[in-house]
């Protein structure tokens, strides 16, 4: 290595920069070992130019000079006054001065100027406050030494939940509890799809892991429903309590300021009951007239008595001032992740369910079933028969929702019409049949081009025969014609006997198949709790070396060897054995306590014992009883 000794003596040794000392300082190291004097005062701009001019030739040749002073503005106030005209608050901006320097001089008021001069020469000041993003919330609390009033919490940040009074504390560390963020569930990591080689049909004696549990799509659907049911909305401006209900979460997917059905502002929420803890759907309707007595709610008792599989159960109805004004509140059963028929089949930009004739027959059977139950109580569905009020709760399973609202909103008009005619409710029930026909016709027209869709019923029925993408049967066209006829008399029982008798068997068959499938899936998951309790006992017992009776000859050591026998086996190639069926088989044998004997070997292969599953089960029960007794 070619080294210029003349320039090396003026170059600071790198060992001094890195380690603070050089072990070759007195053993021939040619570099300088004198640390730079950081206590010298800063050099002004004029003197610095003279200094660079009068420097030695060796210093002039160097590319980096450690003694070069850092740049510092001489007058910050002049810069501030330059931009003072842009904003009236620019002059109020304080000048940044690093604080908290080390050493006793920095803490002495008389030596404040010397401390500032010392800090000004440091390239990196450890006392400079670091930037802390506000979005991290209380996981990174502010410095407890910070004085001044605390900043109010930001309601839009999920983790910023500490009160302002706590931030003013300067003597002790403050613990801020961070709220758990809501992340979408990783369904593909919970139960991954099998590799392609396992998707082919397997022989009867072979199986895969998916056949031991419920299907992935069903598990994902149920998990999404549970997630929607347990969803909360912290720091919202919604009321905390409405009567006995709390934890309001908006679930209405319509952003219209007014309901097109009732022509009044309306919204839908998911709530929890303080009485039974169950979730419910709460419909809020802003009233344009006061309700001063209980007369508008006289039909609520009848509606609560309607028990039908295709009708959303009504819980109660009342008025409330919790939203700041008088509102009508109607509470129904809650079905998570349900969608309306218009969202299920007609919503643009989403994946919609295709229309088929079998699906329409299925809808017709369910709607007729709901209407027969409602009409049998002397009631009418009215506004509930709308594409935006019929909800799809499961695959091809629909229910009428938002019942009894029209009876409350139109109470005065209904009283006047009833006083004029005794057949007023019969007319409302006949109107339900017409709405049923329009709903089926509206869904059927989704199979014809948009240019052919109009409001003329006769033309629509004709286009369904000639221009539809699917071939409707003559029987279905006849049903649409009968439902959309403008006749005064209509017998729903006779209609169902004539047109729906044969279709009922298909619906019943599908429901029974679905019931059998669900029952079979529940059967596969029935014993999961039993094996979980067994594993819990094992983990409570093993790995307690601090216990007085813990030795390699004790009963607990046998249980540990059994744990290793199940989960820490290796094959002949030294690879871990990851076989779920083997684990389930051994746990089932242990739980049953059979007399089958097998060999347990320690990991170092120095200890071995022949034992049966029954002996291990008795040992586990005995040790666990002693553990709970201590």
UniProtKB/Swiss-Prot annotation:
Q: Where is this region: Pseudokinase domain?
A: 231-501
The chain's coiled-coil residues are 502-540
User: What's one GO-annotated cellular component?
Assistant: P-body
- Chain intervals for the UniProt region annotation (Disordered): 38-72, 135-171
Could you list this entry's UniProt keywords, alphabetically sorted.
Answer: ATP-binding, Coiled coil, Cytoplasm, Metal-binding, mRNA processing, Nucleotide-binding, Zinc, Zinc-finger
Region annotation (Knob domain) ranges: 541-630
Q: Where ATP is bound, by residue?
A: 283, 333-340, 388-389
Cellular localization per UniProt: Cytoplasm
Query: Any idea which GO molecular function terms this record carries?
Result: ATP binding; poly(A) binding; zinc ion binding
Q: Where are the zinc fingers (C3H1-type)?
A: 7-36
Name the principal localization, coarsely classed: cytoplasm
Question: Gene3D superfamilies annotated for this entry?
Answer: 1.10.287.3700, 1.20.5.5160, 6.10.250.3160, Transferase(Phosphotransferase) domain 1 (1.10.510.10)
GO BP, one example? Answer: mRNA processing
Bias class Polar residues marks the residues at: 140-149
Task: Specify residue ranges for compositional bias: Low complexity.
Answer: 44-56
> Which Pfam families does this entry report, sorted A to Z?
Pan3_PK (PF18101)
The family line of this record is: Belongs to the protein kinase superfamily. PAN3 family.
Q: What is known of its domains?
A: The N-terminal zinc finger binds to poly(A) RNA. Contains a pseudokinase domain. The protein kinase domain is predicted to be catalytically inactive because some of the residues important for catalytic activity are substituted and it lacks the equivalent of the binding site for a peptide substrate. However, it has retained an ATP-binding site and ATP-binding is required for mRNA degradation, stimulating the activity of the PAN2 nuclease in vitro.
Report quaternary structure and partners.
Answer: Homodimer. Forms a heterotrimer with a catalytic subunit PAN2 to form the poly(A)-nuclease (PAN) deadenylation complex. Interacts (via PAM-2 motif) with poly(A)-binding protein PAB1 (via PABC domain), conferring substrate specificity of the enzyme complex.
* Task of the protein: Regulatory subunit of the poly(A)-nuclease (PAN) deadenylation complex, one of two cytoplasmic mRNA deadenylases involved in mRNA turnover. PAN specifically shortens poly(A) tails of RNA and the activity is stimulated by poly(A)-binding protein PAB1. PAN deadenylation is followed by rapid degradation of the shortened mRNA tails by the CCR4-NOT complex. Deadenylated mRNAs are then degraded by two alternative mechanisms, namely exosome-mediated 3'-5' exonucleolytic degradation, or deadenylation-dependent mRNA decaping and subsequent 5'-3' exonucleolytic degradation by XRN1.
Q: What is this protein called?
A: PAN2-PAN3 deadenylation complex subunit PAN3
